[in-house]
Amino acid sequence: MATWLGKKDENTNTIANKLIVPVGSDWIDNTKILGFYNPLKKTYESTKILDFILLACDNPEIPFFLILGEMNLSHVERYFSDFLSAMESHEKIILYSKDEDCDSDIPESIDLPENLFVTGTVNIDETTYMFSPKVLDRANIIEFIPAQSDVLANFEAETQSIEIEPVNDGSAEGFLALAKTVRETTTLPAGSDICKTILEGISNILDGSGFEFAFRTAKEIRLYINAAYALAQNDEKTLSEEDYVNLMDEQLLQKVLPKVHGNRSQVGTLLSNLSKYSEEQNLKESKKKIDRMLKQLETSQFTSFI
């Protein structure tokens, strides 16, 4: 999508508003993201990511996509803490003190630009770290599980990659305008009462479990629903009750279940209740995932989302 909504730099023939950065296992603080003030040289040592953010600040009319590869090779809370705080407080990120004698074009502080969209890929093995609730509350976790038929087809003949070119038809600007509209919408769309009903049901099941969702989670679910509504209106369509149920299915899967983990005594009853409720409300994808987690709990006495 970042390429499709990309803007080509005519000088370098690259997508100027897309940056892919692999996260290293040595990212122990924010310097790999935001750089640092060098007191010996009296200048600011920038990074590709900071330069990209500043470019986004200078071009607020188009979206910018920052993609972090294998972002859990290091503790996200350590290197991404300033971003997490700015997302919550909307305050400036301080880069260096105004009292420093800094010979640099880098400003003392930056706002987190509204046209910056951050995505990260995740691998789970013995070399990676799990996400804290603070991170999970601010993200949608999308699990990619290839169909076995696709895996076998790739064994027989390697799947060819799809070449994608920027569309340059105003879609990037339209995407950003839609995102801003969704962020500014503070109420749910008409006809979405079923969403509140399902959310209340999930909340009642989670109550007292230690995995209750916070104010931010509820807000982000509302934004997700409003985004789907806005997209439907863009295409001159309306959302049915079934559509709203599917949206809540996706949000249970992407925002609630990723936080659930533990042994049988901690989450056994909780997952069983969520499985039953998902079946009652026709939350099909969540039901499948919960049952896989229950199966893992049965075989290894412990389960987690990923």
Residue ranges of predicted features:
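AAA+ P-loop NTPase catalytic core and its hallmark functional loops
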Residues: M1-D169
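Alpha-helical lid/collar subdomain of P-loop NTPases
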Residues: E114, E158-I306
